[in-house]
């Protein structure tokens, strides 16, 4: 017991702010017993001041491409509101941000990079704050968060933003230019060019995922998303966007404020989905109803060192634990999460049973069902508020959206929900996953009452 108390005393030293801080943390910090729960392999590190934590995570509503409420909204006008929200809701000085990394997929690289820089200016960031983009297909938003976490951990800066943006109205999926003839010599390279829907059919056929299983997954996604919307569960994560709708016939503009996802269909049933024809294969099972929606939207996540969050008195929404990106056969790219999730969970010193919630992107019902079954996951833990088949999948923004949805749900569930995972498949044959820990442990330290005596004893021992 004495060794444990001494070890905790050393850990607490990591949390003490610099001498320049005016807050008296000496009296507010005390050691208390920490257990790893059911996972003995997991080494509790959540008291370290150099943990990378998330203090805010927000997103726009997600709207149907070309037909939804963002059809007349510029991409930079989607990103700016969520960047601004991070600053306004935390009262952070924007000049303190070391970098803004934005995941984005479809737009030309140099153009989208300029749009993201412009959005930062709209949001109130000074010229001294750098901006860059990152593209790892559908995991780009999560990759942006992971890149920022890694940079903070490496000491490049203490505060950063990982974001995601996609306007599939503005930038539809299309290959520009000719294809290198050399691709014909490499089967796997050829498979990188397969339409995503064809890879979905490959997964369904190879692993025996039935049409009914896929349609049922879509029904469940819409049902859960509709229930979450009705219960107001998305209000904490969604930032309303003021924009416009343009009448295509008259050109008249109508100002609107978008505050809810517009692709959710509460009345979706197996019967209605069963009437839809396969899209990618004559006798296939992948339809418009059991695939993710083509969407417009953005999301942003504010990360910093835990010690900085404590100095600023900011509640911690979550702790970034690990990230993994893996490669799989491009012809069945949808299996990516089934490989990436175990890799990320293992890197965190955990087992799958330790994870309380999963946000797994529903690119296609076929691959979602396969990954769920392959890993033997409890359906009650996965996409509890619906997924991309109902909410939408704006490629570059999905990772940031999933992080926001996961962390706010973990916060609502409290101590019964400690670890969460975000994961998705990636076009051309990859998968990505990240592990997060619920972040309110720091609040207990920050809000702890002054301890006059027996400062190194746990509450149970006093």
Curated annotation (Swiss-Prot):
Primary location group: other
Pfam families: Thiolase_C, Thiolase_N
Organ and tissue specificity: Accumulates in etiolated cotyledons and in seedlings, also present in roots, flowers and siliques (at protein level). High levels in wounded leaves.
Reactions catalysed according to its record: an acyl-CoA + acetyl-CoA = a 3-oxoacyl-CoA + CoA
Transit peptide: 1-34
Pathway(s) this gene product operates in, as recorded in its UniProt entry: Lipid metabolism; fatty acid metabolism
Single GO MF annotation: acetyl-CoA C-acyltransferase activity
Localization annotation: Peroxisome; Glyoxysome
Cell membrane listed as a keyword: no
Misc remark: Plants silencing PDE1/KAT2 are defective in the wound-induced synthesis of jasmonate and exhibit delayed senescence both in natural and dark-induced processes.
Record protein name field: 3-ketoacyl-CoA thiolase 2, peroxisomal
